[in-house]
Each structure stands twice: as structure tokens, then as C-alpha cells.
Regions:
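Aromatic- and carboxylate-enriched substrate-binding clefts and catalytic-loop regions
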Residues: 281-481
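Short acidic, Pro/Gly- and aromatic-enriched capping/linker segments at domain boundaries
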Residues: 5-23, 189-208, 676-677
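Trp/Gly-enriched beta-strand surface patches
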Residues: 161-212, 617-670
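C-terminal beta-strand-rich structural cap/linker in extracellular carbohydrate-active enzymes
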Residues: 670-746
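Conserved structural scaffold segments of CAZyme catalytic domains across common CAZy folds
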Residues: 72-330, 335, 350, 510-513, ...
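Active-site-proximal substrate-binding groove within the catalytic cores of carbohydrate-active enzymes
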Residues: 26-28, 39, 44, 405-664, ...
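Non-catalytic positions within long, well-ordered alpha-helices that form the structural scaffold/packing
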Residues: 271-272, 360-361, 506
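Acidic-aromatic substrate-binding/catalytic surfaces of carbohydrate-active enzymes
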Residues: 2-7, 20-99, 107-109
Length: 747
């Protein structure tokens, strides 16, 4: 059996070979065989020879000026010399990239060319080193002397058998769905046994003489696991390698000011604490469309100061229409979306992007936060008084907006080295981050509710996202209302809650938009913020690795407490620190519980592949409270075909767990023959703690001291619900007093 590739460190180089009869693309984990005469795929297997396709059908299809062309019987097949996989832009990893894989991902490539009339149709097949992943791309060049219309374009078509339906994962770069990943019937279509990658409408694209049409790219991975949890970790590890910019994990402040003094003061504060980035967010006043030389010079001077502190910086721009920036006569409208969005394929939008990119270059920006585009928006075309559209009408509007305002604009920004926050799932085009999956109005709820909701959002959102692919929220200043009960200012007064929300952000790896003008307001508060910054920096790679989902947060009706203990669990097999575990008891009672924690991704188990699923209830039983009309959307769980985890015999492998990563707080835990770690914890009410795990013979070096007076999260006891003696006992069970309890000292 082939080892589980996510943990495998040995090389699995790819090859592309032409034999007399076939083109073979393969590595240790995946193999695709194409018949040279017909150009059809005749076999698609995993590293153990398991077949995914039932029969050959077609390699794809295009329709041009109403004439359909099936991709078969090629004119030419070429192997690209060397390790030449395609790159979409130049990319150099930033210092805060936790997994700086080379880009483009190394591998082999082959081109198959079909000549049809005056059209040259090229299909590029790429197979990557060290992973069970292929990529397939479609290009059409018009060699005629007149414009032709690409009516439809299908990059891939596979007839799958039962194994293929279950284990072949496909994703395209033509995706979106408001940040929740791909959805069926937009770029991927399943018709009984046939899996097709094609545009859901159009593209109806006018291709000028001598021009080349770029179809969607399809990523195809032969998954080794049939458990949803393990399969999603395979998808995340594919992303780390084919789009390594998603592993950039800066610590940032969502600054809501464009005042030079406040910006520079924030830079001093962030440099002191050890953050990476300032984001001048919406509401800050930054204007990325401003072409006034004096304004650009002022911004550049401020940004130069920020850079001198070792920080990166950038700002927010609005690419769509919101209530606070209504449509003007020069802003074309998506005719079928009730004027909520500009069309981003107009003369206006082309000028807009040029202004923004020019601003980024002139000011030395490192970052941009773009409100838009949202994928799958369409536009009905020109209307009186609107800007000139650069597309014809409805049928070509979706593809044209994607090409002009996602593919092309993103590439320009990446060439400048820009980190991109975007509101949709555009990672394969070059964006770094979008929302982890949350409802904005949740952050106008009381702080205890926010603490609980953040854990729910981060738990659910990290199934399909690497932690660094998502952001959450931490409203230092008021956001979407809620008043004093919702914001974390004054920070020292609310330090118990502020500490907890920073702790769970650190443990989850999902950094929130810390929205305000400062990180601390006292030396005591500074020490707490600095502590969590140091913890993140110490364990940064581990905290952006394999999130293991077990014991989810389950809120009670009032949304300020949970039913039971919940955990956040991160694992990595290549680092000294193998495991990071945060245990939360946001209940009003003391709980003793034996935890059964899957430890496969630590690399310390005796298993070649994971053969049990996480404990029952780690996905579908999670209730996600809603606060308004825009609840978060997460990918659908797949049927689990592995047995659920249960305690088993001692495997003989033990792990050393250090509470707070302190050598004097060592616990030795057993890993059983199912690869699960057994740990018994006793947690006071409204408390949390964390452990860092190492191989049994290892231990932390240069421990980070816990600052004097740190709340350690466990002081959020609501005094009206517990007797005074129980409050004092709960506090003194874990740490030295005095400690915070809802903003006041408990003595």
C-alpha cells in the first residue's frame, strides 16, 4: 500500500513519457494513460493501481460559431523538456509563509494539439512531484483572419466508476460561491457517471484573429482516504503546493484610521509586539483610487515609515456597490442583481483597476483588501447613462468579469508582490485569504458570545481551508453595533475576554481582523498580547498545519455558554512541536473528561494511513446559530466510510504533553493502536488551557514565561450564577490570584 502522501517526506518525482501507443503521466501516487491515436484517457489509477474511470469518452469539447469540436484524434503530442509546469505569475514567498513550497510546483508537462479548421486547440497536462495531483488546461488560438465566438468550452470529461466517484477530487480555478468553495453546476457537472468541467453559462467569448482563449484549469487529485476529515487535509495539502501563497500567515491590525500620526503610532506598537502587517481597512479613509500626487507622496512617506519598522502595509478598496458608496452614472450595474454590484468588465472597471494597481506600485504597498469581485455575478449589458461595457451581454458577462477582474488583475498585483484579501474563493487565481466563514452581525453580540462563535466558525471553516486561508473578527472598536458589551475596548478592563479571544485565534491559526487603533492600553495588557504573539511565532508552522476536528463547540440557547468541553487540535509531523491542543470549558460547571484525540498527523503513530475517523459528532452535529440573513455556508460533509475512533490498546508509543509549553508541566500520554492519544483533563468552569506535544524524549526549549497577572482565559465566570466560594475555588484551582473576573479582580 502506498503511504499516506500528506505525511510522506520522501520524493515522488513525476514523469511524462511517450511510448509507441500512449502518453503516460505518473508519479508514485497517480497515473494517467492517454492513447496516442485517439487522444483519449484510457486509464486513471492511484499508486496502488486502483482504477477510477469506467470507460473512455472524450477529453473535452469546444463549440465555436455554433460548430462543436470533440477533443479526440490529436494532431500532435509533445513532452515539455525539463520540469516546466506553468506559472501564472512570479511569486516569492514572504517571511510569514509557514510552508514556502516552490512555485510553480515542480513536475512534468505534456501538450496535445488538435487542429480544427483555422483553430488550434491545445490541452496542457501537468503532473506534479510528490502529490497525487494532475492539472489540465485548455487553450484555443484563432488562426483565421476574422473574429470567432467561443460558445462553450469543456476542459475535462471523465466517465468514473464507483471508486472514481468516491476518491477523485476535482476543483477548477473558475470557482467562488462567496467564500465557501466550489459548488456543483457552476464549473463541475455530474451527469450519472460523467464528470464534466465546463462553464455553466457561455463563455460566449469573442476571440479576435490571432488571439488565444484561456479556458478554466482543472485540478484532479486521487484521494487516498474516504473519510471527510482526512480527505479535506489532502485538499489543503494540495493547496499548499499548487498555491503556496495561501500559507502566508501575517499577524495584522485592521487599522481604522488614515491619520499619519495614528498610523505611525500603530506601527510602533505592532513592531514592539512582533506583528507583521497593518491593514488600513474599510472605514479608515484610505483611498486607493486617489491619483493626487500630494496624497500619494504622503501615503508613501507613511508606508516608508511602516517599512522601516519591519512591517508590511496596505489598504482597502471597494470594487462593488454598497449603501455607503452608491452607483454613479459612470458605474455600470449587474442588471440581474438589483444594483448591488458594478459590472467589472467595463471601461470604468478597467480604469478603476489601473488606478488601484498604479497606487499600489507608487506607494510601495504590500497588501490590498478588495471588496469584490464576487464570482458568478452576471450583467445584462449596456444601459443608457452607464459606462461602456467590454462584454456583449448576459451570456459572456460571467466569464468576461472573471477573466478581467480576477485572473488578469490578480496576476498584475502578484507581480508586485501584493498580499490579497478577497471576499471570495479565488485562491487558485492568486488571492491569499477570504473569510473563514462567519456572519458579520455575530461580532456585534456580547463578548462571551463572540468568543464561542469564533470557535464555532474556526472549527467549521478549517475543514476546507488551511487556517491562513481564512480570517475571522475581533472588534476592538465597535463593529455593526452592540455597544460597550460587544467591543473589547477598554482592553485592560475587558482583559479576561480579550485574552481568551486571542488565545483561541492563536490555537486555531485563523487570525482575526483585530479592528481598531491599538493592541493594548496598559503594560498588563501589553504583556498578554505579547505572550500570545510569542506563542504564535514559536509554533507558527504547527499552527498552520493539519487541523484535526474533534469535540466541537456546541452552544446552549443563550449563546454565552457551551454544552461541554470542546477542543482545538493542530498537528505536524515535520516539526519538533508535534501537537498543539487547546481545551475549552465555556460552561458553568467543573468537568473531568477523557479526551480521545486522533494523533495520526503527528507522525508518531504506528500507522501508514489513517484507518479510523475522528470521534462521532465532529461535523454534522454542530449547530451554527444565525443572527441575520447572511449565515455562513460550509461544504457538505461526505459519507464516512471509516470506523469511528474508540479507545484501543497501548501501541507502545507515548507523547509528552506540556501544559502552557512549560517543562515543569509535563504529562505523558499514551497513543493507542488506532493512533489516538488519550488525555484526561479536569477543567474549572469558564476556563481554557493549552498543551504542546512532543515526542516522548523531547521537551520545550527556552519556554515563554507566563506574564504576571495573565487571566489565562479561565476567569470569565459570571458572578451572578455561582456562589462566591465556588468562584474563588475555580480561580485558584489553576493559577495564582489575583485574576480577572468579568473585568474586576477576584481576591
Amino acid at each position: 500500500m502506498t503511504p499516506f502522501w500528506v505525511l510522506k517526506t520522501e520524493k515522488a518525482p513525476a514523469s511524462a513519457v511517450l511510448t509507441e501507443d500512449t502518453l503516460i503521466l505518473e508519479n508514485r501516487y497517480i497515473r494517467r494513460v492517454i492513447d496516442r491515436k485517439t487522444g483519449l484517457t484510457v486509464s486513471l489509477t492511484d499508486g496502488d493501481g486502483t482504477e477510477a474511470i469506467a470507460r473512455s469518452i472524450r477529453e473535452g469539447a469546444v463549440s465555436v460559431d455554433g460548430t462543436g469540436y470533440i477533443l479526440e484524434n490529436p494532431s500532435e503530442i509533445l513532452i515539455r523538456e525539463g520540469s516546466l509546469t506553468e506559472k501564472k505569475f512570479e511569486y516569492i514567498p514572504k517571511p510569514y509563509n509557514t510552508h514556502p513550497y516552490p512555485y510553480p510546483a515542480p513536475g512534468k508537462a505534456a501538450e496535445i494539439t488538435y487542429l480544427r479548421d483555422a483553430l488550434e486547440i491545445r490541452v496542457l497536462y501537468e503532473i506534479f512531484d510528490n502529490m497525487p495531483v494532475l492539472r489540465k488546461s485548455l487553450y484555443v488560438t484563432n488562426h483565421s483572419d476574422h473574429t470567432v465566438t467561443i460558445n462553450t468550452a469543456e476542459t475535462e470529461a471523465l466517465c468514473l466508476n464507483d471508486t472514481g466517484k468516491l476518491q477523485l477530487y476535482l476543483e477548477t480555478d473558475y470557482t467562488g460561491n462567496n467564500g465557501s468553495g466550489f459548488q456543483w453546476n457552476t464549473s463541475l457537472f455530474r451527469d450519472e457517471d460523467i464528470m464534466s468541467a465546463r462553464f455553466d453559462m457561455g463563455p460566449d467569448y469573442d476571440l479576435q484573429a490571432g488571439g488565444t482563449f484561456r479556458g478554466m484549469q482543472v485540478y484532479e487529485m486521487f484521494c487516498q482516504s474516504t473519510c471527510f476529515e482526512h480527505r479535506m487535509n489532502e485538499v489543503q495539502n494540495m493547496y499548499r503546493r499548487v498555491a503556496p501563497w495561501v500559507c502566508e500567515a501575517p499577524l495584522f491590525l485592521h487599522l481604522i484610521s488614515d491619520d499619519s500620526k495614528e498610523l505611525r503610532d500603530s506601527a510602533d506598537m505592532l513592531a514592539d509586539i512582533g506583528y507583521d502587517m497593518i491593514i488600513q481597512s474599510f472605514g479608515s479613509g484610505i483611498d486607493l483610487e486617489n491619483e493626487d500626487p500630494a496624497y500619494i507622496e504622503r501615503v508613501k512617506n507613511d508606508y516608508d515609515y511602516v517599512h522601516s519598522k519591519g512591517l508590511t502595509i496596505g489598504g482597502y478598496t471597494l470594487a462593488i456597490i454598497r449603501d455607503y458608496r452608491p452607483m454613479n452614472h459612470d458605474c455600470a450595474t449587474n442588471g440581474d442583481h438589483n444594483q448591488i454590484s458594478r459590472c467589472l468588465c467595463t471601461k470604468w472597471s478597467a480604469d478603476y483597476w489601473n488606478r488601484v494597481v498604479s497606487f499600489l506600485a507608487k506607494t510601495g504597498s504590500d497588501f490590498i483588501e478588495i471588496d469584490g469581485p464576487y464570482h458568478f455575478y452576471t450583467c445584462t449589458g449596456n444601459k443608457p447613462g452607464q459606462a461602456e461595457h467590454l462584454h456583449k451581454g448576459l451570456a459572456d458577462s460571467r466569464y468576461s468579469q472573471w477573466l478581467k477582474s480576477t485572473v488578469e488583475v490578480t496576476a498584475k498585483m502578484k507581480e508586485l508582490g501584493i498580499y490579497i484579501n478577497a471576499p471570495d474563493w479565488l485562491y487558485l487565481s492568486g488571492t491569499n485569504k477570504c473569510g473563514v466563514g462567519y456572519e458579520e452581525i455575530a461580532f456585534s453580540q456580547p463578548r462571551l458570545t463572540q468568543i464561542l462563535m469564533n470557535r464555532i466558525y474556526n472549527y467549521m471553516g478549517t475543514y476546507h481551508k488551511i487556517p491562513s486561508m481564512g480570517w475571522s473578527f475581533l472588534p476592538v472598536e465597535e463593529y455593526h453595533g452592540g455597544g460597550a458589551a460587544a467591543k473589547f475596548e477598554p482592553l485592560t478592563e475587558n482583559l479576561a475576554e480579550y485574552d481568551w479571544v486571542l488565545a483561541e485565534a492563536a490555537a486555531s491559526g485563523v487570525w482575526p481582523c483585530v479592528r481598531g487603533k491599538r493592541l493594548y492600553d496598559s503594560e498588563l495588557c501589553r504583556q498578554v498580547v505579547k505572550y500570545w504573539t510569542d506563542v504564535i511565532r514559536r509554533h507558527k508552522k504547527l499552527l498552520n498545519s493539519n487541523t484535526v476536528h474533534v469535540y466541537p463547540p456546541k452552544p446552549l440557547k443563550e449563546l454565552q455558554t457551551a454544552e461541554d468541553i470542546d477542543v482545538i487540535l493542530q498537528e505536524n509531523n515535520t516539526t519538533r512541536d508535534k501537537l498543539f491542543l487547546m481545551v475549552c470549558n465555556q460552561t458553568e460547571r467543573t468537568i473531568t473528561k477523557q479526551l480521545l484525540l486522533p494523533a495520526f498527523y503527528t507522525g508518531l503513530t504506528t500507522l501508514e494511513r489513517p484507518h479510523t475517523a475522528p470521534k462521532s459528532g465532529s461535523f454534522d452535529d454542530v449547530t451554527i446559530p444565525g443572527f441575520g440573513s447572511w449565515p455562513p455556508v460550509y461544504p457538505e460533509n461526505m459519507e464516512n466510510l471509516l470506523e469511528e475512533a474508540v479507545p484501543a490498546e497501548d501501541s507502545g508509543v507515548h507523547m509528552a504533553l506540556f501544559e502552557h509549553d512549560l517543562p515543569e508541566k509535563r504529562t505523558e500520554a499514551v497513543i493507542d493502536t488506532n493512533g489516538n492519544l488519550l488525555l484526561t483533563v479536569t477543567m474549572p468552569p469558564m476556563s481554557y488551557t493549552y498543551y504542546v506535544g512532543y515526542a516522548a524524549e523531547d521537551m520545550p526549549e527556552d519556554p515563554i514565561p507566563v506574564p504576571e497577572g495573565k487571566p489565562f482565559g479561565c476567569r470569565l465566570i459570571r458572578e451572578e450564577t455561582l456562589p462566591e466560594t465556588e468562584i474563588k475555588n475555580a480561580v485558584s484551582d489553576i493559577c495564582q490570584i489575583p485574576r480577572f473576573c468579568v473585568g474586576v479582580y477576584v481576591t
